[in-house]
Each structure stands twice: as C-alpha cells, then as structure tokens.
Amino acid sequence: NAIPELLHDSGVGGVIDLDKVPSDDPSLSPLELWCNESQERYVLGVPAARLAEFAAICERERCPFAAVGVATAEQRLVAGYGATVASVYGGSGARGDVPGPAPRGGDPDGQGGGVAHEALSGPAPHGGDLDEQRGSVVHEALPGPAQRAGRPDDLRGSAAQAEIPVSGPRAQPAGVGEGADRGGASASAHPIDLPMDVLFGKPPKMHRDTVHPPVPHWPELATRGLELHQAGLRVLAHPTVAAKSFLVTIGDRSVGGLTAREQMVGPWQLPVADCAITLAGFDTVAGEAMAIGERAPLALLDSAAAARMAVGEAITNLCAAPVETLDTVKLSANWMAAAGFDGEDALLYDAVRAVGMALCPDLDLAIPVGKDSLSMQAQWDDGASDAAPASAPAHRSVSPVSLVVSAFAPVADASTQLTPLLAREADTDLWLIGLGAGKQRLGGSVLAQVHPGEGALPAFAGPVPDLDDPQRLRGFFELVRDARRDGLLLAYHDRSDGGAFAALCEMAFASHLGLDIGLDGWGEDPFRALFNEELGAIVQVAGENRAAFADLVERHALTECAQRIARPTTAPVVRVIEGQDVLAEWRWEELFDAWWSVSHAMQKLRDNPEAADAERAAARDFAAPGLKPRLTFDPAEDVAAPFVATGARPKVAILREQGVNGQIEMANAFERAGFDSFDVHMSDLVAGRVDLAGFRGLAACGGFSYGDVLGAGRGWATSVLERPALRAMFAAFFARSDSFALGVCNGCQMLSQLKEIIPGADGWPRFVRNRSEQFEARTALLEVVESPSIFLRGMEGARLPVAVAHGEGRAEFASAIEQAAARVALRYVDGHGQAATAYPLNPNGSPEGITGLTTTDGRVTILMPHPERTPRTLNLSWAPADWPAGSPWLRMFRNARVWVA
C-alpha cells in the first residue's frame, strides 16, 4: 500500500521498477514482492534534483536505500521488472534508470544493517515542482561537519525536504540484478498497470444481510451466598485487574527526555497510572496526554454498551491529565470483529452506530483516525478425526466485537496532573463519582467471571454497565477539571475492571496505606457496591475542602453520583465497614499478593526466577521506604551562571553511532548548562569531516549501537580501536588535560571498552547482561559517591532518583583487585542509604550497586543510568513536591561548565 497511497495523496501516478526493490530472495514472484508486509520499510518521495542530497544523508546515517521509480503526471500505476517512463510511455522500450543520480545504497563501510529507505523520485506533475505543488511531507536532516545544534530541536542540522516516506531490506545479493528471472516473470513484464482510480476510486457500498445472534444462555450472578473476603482476593488476582509490572519494566519509557507521566507511580513505583503525558519541548510544561479505553467482554452481552463504555473509559482515564475542554479530545478507534461469523456483523453494526452516530456526535468528539481488524476468527483441525468433513473444523476460536479507543488531547501544564498516589494528610476522604447514578450492574464484570454458576459456566449474564447519559460524562469531565483548577483534588483514579474495590486497593498499594471503606448509604448489596464496573472515578479530597467540593459537585448536577466512600489509614489493613459492623478485613500484604500474583508468575516464567521472587518480596514490604531522596546541595542554584554570562559556549561533541537514540536529550542537557552541542556521527569521524580536536567535551549517548549483536557497546568500541586513524584521534582527545568525556548507557559500555586509551581508567569493568536476564526500565535511587569526577563535584552524599533503561548494565570486574582499585562515582542504594545488592533496587546485579565510575583525574565519567533524560523534575516518575523545576541532575552538566570555565 505504501507507494500507491503516497502517489495518490500527491495526486500523481508512478512507474516502479521491481528490479530496483532490494530483496534477499530472488525467488519472490511479483505478487510476493509487491504485496508482502515487510516491516521497517519506508517510502519517501524525493525531488530528482535533490536525490544526491538524500543519498548523502543516508550515507552519513549508514542507511541503505534504493530509488525504485518516478512519479508521473498521469494518475496511472505501473510496476514491473525494468519498468521505466520510456518503456511505458514510448521510445525503444528498453530499460532505463530513474532520472537523476540513483545510488543503490548508503553503506560505504559495507556494514549494512539499519532501516533501508527506497526513494521514489522523478519529474513533478504538470512540469512543476513537487515541493511547491504538494507541500513537504517529510523533512530529512543533513548536518554539515560538526554543525552546531543551537537548540536541541536543531540537532539534526539543516533540513533537506523530501516528499513521501519507503524502505526495504539490504541491497540485493550478488547475481540478482536487472534482467533476472524473478518468480518466473519475464524481465519486461508489467504485472501491475492500472489507473489509480481502480485502487482509490469510490467503491460501491457494501450491503450485508445479517441477523442478531441468539442471547447467550449464561447464568446471572447471584451475590447471595458469596464470601466477601474471598471475592476481593479473586477479583484482584484476575489477569484483567492484576498488576502488569512484568510488561511495563521491559519497555523504555524515558527515552527522548520528554516523558512527564508514565505507568509507574509514586515512591514505590507501581504501574497504576491512568494516562500518559509527554512534553511538547524541553522548555515548556505544555504537552500531550494519551489514554485508552476498552471493555470488550461486555460485547458478549451488549456490543453497543461495550463500545460506549470504551469511549467513556478513555475519557475517565484522560481526566487525570489537565485537559481543558472536551472538544480538544481526539479519538482513535480500533475495531475488531469476526466478520461473517453468525450474527457478528449485526453486533458490529450496533457498536459502530452507537459510537459513530450517537455518542460521539452528542459529545462533540471526533474520531479522525482508526483501523479495523475484521478477521478475528480462526479454525483448525488437530488431525484427530480424519473422517471429519472439511466444513466442520475440530476447533474454532472467535473473538467478540471489540473496540479499543485511544484518546489524545493537549495539556497546558503537565505539572498539574493527578495520579492515584494518596496524600498522607491527617484528614482526607475518598469520594466516588459514579456515572451509573446509583445503578450497580454486574453483567460481564470481573466479579461475575471469577464466580462460576450452573454447570461451571461463569455467572456472566445480566444487565451490563453502560453510558446511559452522555451529558453526565461531560459534567464529570468538567467537575474534575474545575476541582483540579481550584486545588481541591489530591489524588485521582478511574473506576474500571474490578470496580471501586480494585481502584481503592490500587491507590492503597501505590501509597503504602490502609483503607477503611464505608458502605453506609452506598446501596444494600456490598458486592454490587464494591465490584460494579460502571464508569466513574475515585478522588481524594482534604477534610477542609469537603464543603467546597460538595458545592462543586452540586453545580455540575452530579449530586446523585457522588459519595464519600473511604478514608486512608496508616495501618496495613483494608476493611469494609457498614455501620458498626466490619464486613471483611484483609491484611495489606494479603491483597497485594493477590494483585501481584499474575505479574510474578509471568516474570518467573520469562526472566530469572530468582529476580521475580526478589521483586515480589520487595514490592510486598509495607514498611519499605521506597524512593527516599536526600539532597546535599541546592538544585535551584545555577553554579554555571557566572560562566554562561560571559557568552562563551564551549563545544561538546554529541557522539552517536548507528542504533544510538539518546542524542537529542543529551544535547539538551549540555545546552541548558551553557555548552554548544554538535551532532557528530561516527561516520563523520570515519570520513574525516569532523575531528575531535575541535571540541572541549565528548558525550557518548545511549541506545543500541549495532543492535548490541556483538555485546553492548563492543561493536562501537571496536570500530574505534581497529581503525588506526580513529584510535589515534580518540587517544589524543582523552590525553588532553583540557578535555572531558561522559558516557551514558550504551556510551558507558562503549567507553569502558576504550579504557586502554583513556588515561586513569585502569580497573574499569565491562558491562554484561543484567542478572534478571531482561531489559530493565525503571526509576532507581542513586547515591553520589565521593570521587574525582568533575561532573559530580559538590553532589557527594546526595541520593537521587534517576531513569534506568538497559539490558546489559551489570559491572563485571576482571578481578577483586581491579574492583577495589576502581574509582566508583555512583551506586544504587535503598531507601535507607545502604548499597543496593538486591533486585530490583539494584536492577542489574552489579557488585555493591556500582553503576558509575570515573578516571583518576575525574575528566572522564561513565554511568549506566540516564541523568540526561531527567534535567527537569517534571521528567522524573516521582519526586518530592518541594523540589524546584530544575532537577538535581542538571547540576552534573553545570559542574562540567564550571570546570571548563
């Protein structure tokens, strides 16, 4: 689809030479070559006059590409082996190359790898210029030698415009060139030759005749006879409700340095956040919020209600972010169904009509994007019965109609976000704002799923939760917005799977607090009250603000929806109380173990089982201090200010290699401290375009150079050590008394393997696979150890949270003697300030928590964590409320500016 869609959006046609499409498999037929869904392939439309400029970009980035065709004024698509404008539109019909220079690759060193880019270039339609007529779609960067970054946004250098994104694998193997017989097709064949309207013209509307399926004969849950204590444990252990930490910690959530809210919340770092927030830039608090809603199980009973609930849940999740108006929210709808299966088409129609023709228009919500997957069924025969007819497969799996809604909205000030972390004030209440307005429907609920009915079937049936009044959702949104604006809310968590009980427990887990849950006036049935999954949220309000909050609820016409339901306590106990009676009581650890059970089981199967056990033991410790920072300096003090005021801006090379992805945030950190950051690719050094002699500092950035296939950082380091000119350049730089260097993450791994040419680096370890046998992305607590490091002067003794993201961060010393001689600069510690030796406080298993080292004179420092991603307090997953806007980690970079003086 990529090439035709790009041409169609530009109002042109194209001639594509299939011989030019890179492929490692010469046997592919034209159909397979054209229609396979290879990943990481991008199409770019490049003006022919600028193809050489584009080729230079690819060469610098070690990125293979191929020019595969030309755009034409006639809206006609032609693709074939040897297809050219001349062969299609006249002339001899012989093959011809794409007009303009058409290099076949951008990997001068022969190292391959990376993402291949195919460039679709050619004459502009109607004799004009594509840039002028169609506008620029993609901007590629071509920094000159050591081009000054200026602002981090300028790190890419001067932009070369390119229209249309494509790509392919590496260049063809030897012997597969023009004229080769691919899949039996003749070299001159044009297997694709058709007007663009055939692909993109308006097709006739599809008409389908379908009927609703019969109502499922599941039993309905009868709460009489259920045991409340056991029900709470079962609900928390259900995979839908249970903790998802095992999924969260394997994904890098801090890369880019613009994250303002990720899944983990609070000093104990539990994955209970309602939404994600990213910042729009390095110098603003404005940004974007994202949230998801889905209630697919309800579609088994009522597909329209399930769709409305998905939209509603996306909005209630998004309310944790400071979104100003509902009309700024945009939705993406991902529809899934088993089209053609008995009755599913009718259910899909019900769901689409409910959302697209009723709910969203009522709320002025737009759904500008989305996708559909309408083949959500599979059938197979296990071969047990050879006599079974082909029309009756032995097994069939059919997915219910499902809608996953992603909501996006701008936020003006990300610092005013709300999380489920409860404030530890003496007098606070937890209020439930329930949009069911007293309805407590249990159909399709997790409570129903964990209690079998007749014949061991889940007691799943009954009325399902629904968004009965769309304007009530609008009132809820505006209530939360106004209460936040007035400073009335201390914490927020939406009610969803598992009901209010699950939401309350997650707030208690994240805060290491107990709860007294009061049922007075909340309904006659404690099971329906606690476990119904109607839309809503729980908010924490200080006692002194009760009246103001109640008044605000009344002004938004939600009085019948709001009720005080719980109070936080410092005891490790959760109780459900009605009047003077305690209906159920759980130990905090008992509930937490149930909630953590799924994550622990999955982690134990996937990772080092000992690490999974250690994390569970640490997470369930109610008395654990969590992240407990300690400052030994004033982070608000800008020690570099006098030197920055002189106007001098020393030059720092922001060094990267193929696969490195942390250069933007590294440049930002140095720029904020008064340096000039320059984007330096290793290919610049290899080609002689840049020399390190022109820089005072060097920063080797994080990422995955060469995909870590030779070991983290090893390929990068070897590319220096095995090239005499580069080895001499780096050795000369490190030998200078006026130079400094910083290596972070992949850069740390790389510099550690250059220690033979770094004076004073004797005893540095190499960094190997984490003890957990897994990539670890967490917020950890670091202590600054007394050392010669120029980056850490005046920070000694401080304990600071920092982003961690690596798979090979365990320091491995050649001997105990070398470890004793190593100049340790940073180490992981626990909340008590002791060296962290246990997982996950020590996320990689390094001895004595060692994670940062320096040289004898302190000019070169390496560390595995990412201080450059957290130069602002807002970048930290959690920080004390009284910290200034500038993170303590900014002092590192300011110290370097002071040293350069």
Label the model's feature ranges:
Residues 49-50, 73, 84, 436-438, ...:
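Short acidic/polar capping segments at secondary-structure boundaries
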Residues 704-789:
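Cysteine-nucleophile active-site neighborhood
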Residues 54, 441-442, 549, 664, ...:
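Short glycine-/acidic-enriched loop or helix-start segments at secondary-structure transitions
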Residues 87-188, 390-391:
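Intrinsic disorder/low-complexity segments
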Residues 494, 745, 866:
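Active-site glycine-centered loops adjacent to acidic/histidine catalytic or metal-binding residues
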Residues 1-90, 179-697, 701, 706, ...:
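Glycine/proline-enriched, intrinsically flexible loops and inter-domain linkers
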Residues 688-690, 731-732, 764-901:
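Amide-donor transfer/coupling interface in amidating biosynthetic enzymes
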Residues 63, 693, 737, 848, ...:
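Structured loop/turn residues at beta-strand edges in well-structured enzyme cores
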